[in-house]
């Protein structure tokens, strides 16, 4: 394969703008799926949580061949919480395809990845997707994208970007606008040809000393650690002697490559050699980490290490100490939790883990609430049992002054909900930056708000907008501390003893607040069973039964009516709790509890 026949592109899109569907179409139309093969939808989101939530978490690769050119496609996460994945994915490509919904326009998460791509000097190709939607406004999207690039400091060359109109779900693309309701182009060839024309081919020299930077890691029980990266120059072959270096100042560690694999469709195919521009997987080296350079032992040419954004949120992961501990989980000890977190660090670069002074409690720092709850959800599905504390933001000290992370929030809401949302964001120390009505009864609000103010806001936002609002946020900068933000408005109902919940007890508590539990659920002293209708905590008896006597009551007894409980998901629990509370996570249940279970312990701690 000559060098000119390779193109490496990344696809950038906001959640639900149709990126994964678009990749499905590119794979189909390039003939990657043979006629007899079963075509799976959303091939790129192959992790169980990704399929359920419809979000991309891990940066993944696939490759298609179009008119003799090998195109490597790198799928990037659209969410700022996975910034670590985004930066590494972009280090492997020469151009980016920015996919934007023809109705919604550019969103904050798109902005995050686009800013990174433009800063690296990558040239964008704009794809306006879903142009067949009834509310599509392609002209608005193209202008909004131009303004966005300009704001993010794009060069004149980057601002002269090609535009492709497409409908990913129907499998067509076009370079010119057509009539609404009609098909504007025959197939995806317009997009393929634009990529070949505008993405520069790799310029590396195959005869130069090898230079391969590892951008992602994988693990296989058969061959051990697998490194994924793009060859900048030189040629790599199986059984070749190399050195591994952590940047120009790193110490060279000798090693030997075992296998070299390249991407073909979604498959990994063994290769006898690979040259500049190819994205390869290699194994046989145990000392590889993210950002290291694999280079020639005689004339090493290491690249600088990849820079990843610092974490902004921290949580404590603790051993589960509740009376129900060990009943539902397979892995419950602090050693098992610690080992699992160390394993996660091998490929989750934006994560930090450290031990605390207290035994069985580890401090885990990440890029945001979603980043950490996805890790918890993965651990829970693997059979882990633990408790976690309320998330806290990571503060910085600048010139002796306390600084905190500020987020940029975009809320798309109906005009009737505008007052309530603005009041709630104001209470959380948010500053309104921009307000833009779309002329169709909806309005877009842009706020700058402390990251602390967003913890627990998602649930409140959904209630305020009756589920019709869209909100997304992105880290902006560190600024001086903005002062105290009020906590939760309601207190909680706390169980006074252990046992099973009875319908009779719930009936008596119905007017006290909303419940998290249902009849026959096990409870223990100190467990949170509901939200109190007032602002104080209340200890209640959720296990009481009706006293039976030998008197018969005239008339039929009234049936007990109870309100259905609030479903407590992992995200809801983490957002809901206060500093003196924990979320207990097991493979089967999510429970909320007080940190100190008995009332006497709570009083002592509160002094």
Task: Describe the residue ranges of each PLM region.
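Residue-level signature of catalytic and energy-coupling elements of molecular machines
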Residues: 16, 22, 54, 73-75, ...
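Interdomain boundary/hinge elements
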Residues: 38-42, 152-164, 202-213, 249-263, ...
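P-loop NTPase switch module centered on the Walker A-proximal segment
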Residues: 1-100, 104-106, 144, 217-220
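Alpha-helical scaffold elements adjacent to nucleotide-binding pockets in ATP/GTP-utilizing enzyme cores
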Residues: 25-26, 63, 85-88, 92, ...
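Conserved nucleotide-binding/hydrolysis modules and their immediate coupling elements
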Residues: 211-315, 325-327, 490, 498-549, ...
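A short, contiguous, amphipathic alpha-helix enriched in charged residues
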Residues: 322-345, 559, 563
């Amino acid at each position: 394969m000559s060098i000119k026949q390779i193109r490496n592109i990344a696809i950038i899109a906001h959640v639900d703008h149709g990126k994964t569907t678009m990749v499905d179409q590119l794979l189909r139309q390039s003939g990657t799926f043979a006629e007899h093969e079963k075509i799976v939808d959303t091939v790129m989101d192959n992790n169980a949580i990704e399929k359920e939530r419809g979000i991309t978490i891990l940066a993944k690769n696939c490759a298609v061949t179009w008119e003799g050119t090998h195109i490597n496609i790198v799928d990037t996460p659209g969410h700022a919480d996975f910034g670590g994945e985004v930066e590494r994915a972009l280090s492997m490509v020469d151009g980016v395809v920015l996919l934007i919904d023809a109705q919604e326009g550019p969103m904050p998460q798109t902005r995050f990845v686009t800013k990174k791509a433009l800063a690296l000097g990558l040239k964008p190709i704009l794809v306006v997707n879903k142009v067949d939607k009834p509310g599509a406004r392609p002209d608005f999207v193209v202008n909004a994208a131009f303004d966005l690039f300009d704001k993010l400091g794009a060069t004149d060359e980057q601002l002269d970007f090609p535009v492709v109109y497409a409908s990913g779900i129907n499998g067509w693309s076009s370079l010119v606008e057509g009539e609404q309701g009609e098909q504007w182009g025959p197939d995806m060839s317009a997009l393929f040809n634009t990529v070949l024309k505008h993405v520069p081919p790799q310029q590396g020299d195959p005869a130069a000393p090898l230079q391969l930077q590892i951008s992602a890691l994988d693990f296989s029980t058969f061959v051990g650690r697998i490194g994924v990266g793009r060859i900048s120059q030189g040629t790599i072959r199986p059984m070749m002697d190399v050195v591994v270096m952590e940047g120009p100042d790193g110490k060279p560690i000798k090693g030997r490559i075992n296998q070299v694999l390249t991407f073909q469709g979604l498959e990994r195919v063994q290769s006898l050699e690979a040259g500049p521009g190819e994205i390869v997987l290699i194994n046989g080296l145990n000392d590889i980490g993210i950002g290291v350079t694999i280079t020639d032992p005689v004339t090493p040419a290491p690249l600088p290490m990849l820079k990843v954004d610092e974490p902004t949120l921290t949580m404590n992961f603790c051993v589960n100490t509740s009376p129900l501990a060990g009943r539902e989980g397979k892995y419950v000890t602090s050693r098992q939790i610690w080992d699992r977190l160390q394993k996660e660090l091998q490929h989750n670069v934006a994560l930090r883990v450290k031990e605390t002074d207290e035994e069985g409690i580890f401090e885990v720092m990440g890029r945001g609430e979603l980043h950490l709850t996805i890790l918890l959800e993965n651990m829970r599905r693997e059979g882990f049992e633990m408790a976690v504390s309320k998330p806290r933001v990571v503060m910085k000290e600048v010139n002796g002054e306390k600084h905190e992370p500020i987020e940029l929030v975009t809320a798309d809401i109906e005009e009737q909900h505008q007052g309530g949302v603005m009041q709630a964001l104001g209470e959380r120390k948010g500053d309104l930056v921009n307000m833009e009505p779309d002329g169709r009864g909806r309005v877009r609000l842009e706020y700058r708000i402390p990251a602390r103010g967003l913890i627990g806001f998602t649930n409140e936002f959904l209630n305020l907008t009756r589920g019709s609002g869209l909100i997304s946020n992105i880290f902006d900068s560190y600024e001086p501390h903005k002062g105290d933000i009020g906590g939760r408005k309601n207190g909680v109902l706390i169980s006074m003893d252990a046992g099973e919940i009875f319908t009779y007890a719930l009936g008596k508590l119905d007017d006290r607040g909303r419940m998290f539990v249902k009849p026959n659920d096990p409870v223990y002293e100190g467990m949170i069973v509901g939200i109190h209708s007032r602002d104080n905590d209340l200890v209640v008896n959720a296990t009481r039964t009706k006293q039976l006597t030998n008197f018969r009551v005239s008339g039929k007894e009234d049936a007990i009516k109870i309100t259905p409980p609030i479903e407590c998901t992992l995200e809801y629990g983490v957002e809901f709790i206060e500093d003196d509370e924990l979320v207990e996570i097991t493979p089967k249940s999510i429970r909320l509890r007080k940190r100190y279970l008995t009332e006497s312990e709570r009083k002592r701690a509160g002094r």
